[in-house]
């Protein structure tokens, strides 16, 4: 089966008409190379790949004319008898041919050469002896047509695929061209806008410089005109010059008179200020003397109060109103030593009085000033000591009040303890009465123990001592023992009288023994 010849142009190119800017203005047409340059696609583009498919010599999709090729071209066909048997369309449309293929299985058959093209089929069997005769039969001619039909069908599918690829490439090229021209327009617009802004800025700068230049020119012109107007006329009248000189001389004389008057008034003011300074200094000295005398009197009063407070503290300490303290003891010793050594040279300095009426006292004398400074320092020291003693006095008063509160609390506790003691004595008396009623020997023992205690100390003294100490005497439970002789006899009598009776314990009140202790106000070193 011969294929129709298709002229293959030597120079085919894809030309884009860029005269317009719309998408419809881009037309794709194939033309000869008359007046246009050939189109050279890039190696990586889809167009180059699709065009390169036509350049392979042994490709299945290549269908060329015999005169364009130098020799015989061989094409391998991938279709065979099993593929024809598997086609349902052949089975339905050509049942006799299908039965022929199924019965004969002509796998040795290959299509006849056409226009210098030799067809080869894969997986062929050896040729039979009468293969030339068999080729002329109708079934084998039908088989040859089927081979060529499937070959052409395959070529058509490849051409459709290539056409589709070309259409896609054309579409991509159109989109790329539109994008390229859009981008070019955007860049052009951006450049034009930026240039327009720069031009506007330059125009504004130009206007500003022109205005500034005009303003500077006007100001310079005005200043020059003013300076020219201020320049005096050198060639003026001599009378005007003489008048000006006379005016200047009169001004100078007036200023000299004013300076002399001002100097005289300043001298008078200076003398007046010096006199006022002397008056103020004398008044200040008198006030200082008055203050010194007042402070001397106050210091004497404070010393008297200090002495009285020391005496009161000493009396309170000696009478026992204040507890023993090392600080108070040292202060009392110091006051006693000052009292015995009172005729010291510093006694006369405790109350200095400055006589302001004496004419011998002068503020300009350095000896008097030194004496005033010493007396002032001594007064300050005495004032500090007086303040310290006043603070100490407040502390002592607070301590006395605290001790008074403690003594009141102690008296309240003593009253409570006395009430408890009276209750305990009543209970003991009841116990004694009960013991007398129940057991005669036990009552006798209690009476003997009470008699012994009453012999040791009088009852009224015992009660006074117990109340003074503020605590009740301890009660001791004494178990009967057989250590004493008298107790042995009593126990034997009791056992004989009551052989099966249990011996009851003895309740005894133990009074503490009074020790000779030094008095509260007595010093520890007075015994020596």
From Swiss-Prot:
The sequence repeat boundaries are: 185-213, 285-313
Q: Which PANTHER family match?
A: COILED-COIL DOMAIN-CONTAINING PROTEIN 6, H4 D10S170 PROTEIN-RELATED
Q: What is this protein called?
A: Uncharacterized protein T09B9.4
Q: Where is this region: 2 X 29 AA repeats?
A: 185-313
Cystine crosslinks: none
Keyword Kinase found? no
The reply to whether Amino-acid biosynthesis figures as a keyword in the UniProt entry is: no
- Source organism phylogeny: Eukaryota, Metazoa, Ecdysozoa, Nematoda, Chromadorea
Q: Where is this region: Disordered?
A: 1-51, 467-497, 509-528
Q: Which organism is it from?
A: Caenorhabditis elegans
Pfam families according to UniProt? DUF2046
The record's InterPro entries line, in alphabetical order, gives:
DUF2046
UniProt keywords, alphabetically: Repeat
Q: According to the UniProt entry, which residue ranges have a biased composition of type Polar residues? A: 472-496
């Amino acid at each position: 089966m011969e294929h129709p010849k298709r002229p293959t142009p030597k120079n085919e190119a894809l030309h884009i008409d860029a005269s317009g800017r719309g998408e419809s203005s881009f037309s794709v047409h194939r033309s000869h190379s008359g007046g246009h340059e050939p189109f050279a696609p890039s190696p990586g583009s889809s167009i180059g790949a699709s065009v390169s498919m036509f350049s392979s010599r042994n490709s299945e999709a290549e269908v060329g004319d015999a005169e364009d090729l130098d020799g015989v071209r061989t094409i391998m066909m991938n279709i065979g008898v099993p593929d024809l048997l598997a086609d349902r369309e052949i089975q339905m449309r050509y049942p006799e041919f299908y039965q022929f293929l199924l019965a004969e299985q002509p796998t040795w058959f290959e299509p006849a050469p056409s226009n210098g093209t030799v067809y080869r089929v894969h997986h062929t069997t050896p040729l039979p002896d009468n293969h030339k005769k068999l080729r002329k039969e109708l079934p084998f001619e039908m088989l040859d047509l089927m081979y060529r039909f499937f070959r052409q069908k395959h070529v058509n599918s490849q051409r459709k695929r290539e056409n589709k690829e070309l259409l896609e490439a054309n579409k991509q090229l159109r989109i790329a061209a539109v994008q390229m021209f859009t981008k070019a327009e955007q860049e052009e617009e951006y450049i034009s806008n930026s240039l327009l802004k720069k031009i506007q800025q330059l125009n504004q700068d130009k206007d500003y410089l022109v205005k500034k230049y005009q303003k500077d020119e006007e100001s310079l012109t005005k200043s020059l005109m003013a300076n020219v107007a201020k320049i005096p006329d050198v060639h003026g009248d001599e009378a005007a010059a003489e008048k000006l000189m006379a005016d200047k001389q009169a001004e100078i004389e007036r200023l000299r008179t004013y300076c002399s008057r001002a100097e005289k008034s300043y001298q008078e003011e200076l003398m007046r200020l010096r006199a006022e300074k002397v008056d103020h200094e004398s008044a200040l000295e008198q006030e200082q003397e008055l203050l010194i005398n007042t402070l001397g009197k106050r210091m004497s009063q404070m010393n008297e109060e200090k002495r009285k407070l020391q005496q009161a503290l000493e009396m309170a300490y000696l009478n026992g109103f204040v507890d023993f303290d090392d600080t108070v003891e040292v202060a009392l010793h110091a006051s006693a030593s000052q009292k015995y050594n009172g005729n010291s040279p510093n006694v006369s300095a405790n109350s200095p009085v400055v006589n302001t009426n004496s004419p011998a006292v002068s503020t300009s004398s350095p000896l008097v000033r030194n004496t005033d400074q010493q007396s002032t320092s001594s007064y300050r020291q005495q004032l500090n000591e007086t303040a310290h003693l006043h603070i100490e006095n407040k502390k002592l008063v607070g301590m006395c009040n605290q001790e008074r509160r403690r003594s009141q609390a102690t008296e309240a506790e003593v009253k409570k303890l006395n009430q408890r003691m009276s209750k305990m004595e009543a209970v003991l008396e009841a116990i004694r009465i009960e013991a007398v009623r129940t057991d005669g020997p036990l009552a006798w023992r209690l009476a003997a123990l009470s008699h012994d205690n009453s012999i040791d100390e009088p009852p009224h003294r015992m009660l006074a001592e117990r109340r003074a100490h503020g605590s009740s005497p301890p009660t001791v439970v004494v178990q009967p023992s057989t250590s004493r002789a008298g107790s042995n006899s009593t126990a034997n009598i009791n056992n004989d009288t009551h052989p099966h009776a249990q011996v009851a314990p003895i309740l005894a009140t133990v009074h503490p023994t009074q020790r000779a202790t030094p008095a509260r106000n007595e010093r520890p070193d007075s015994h020596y």
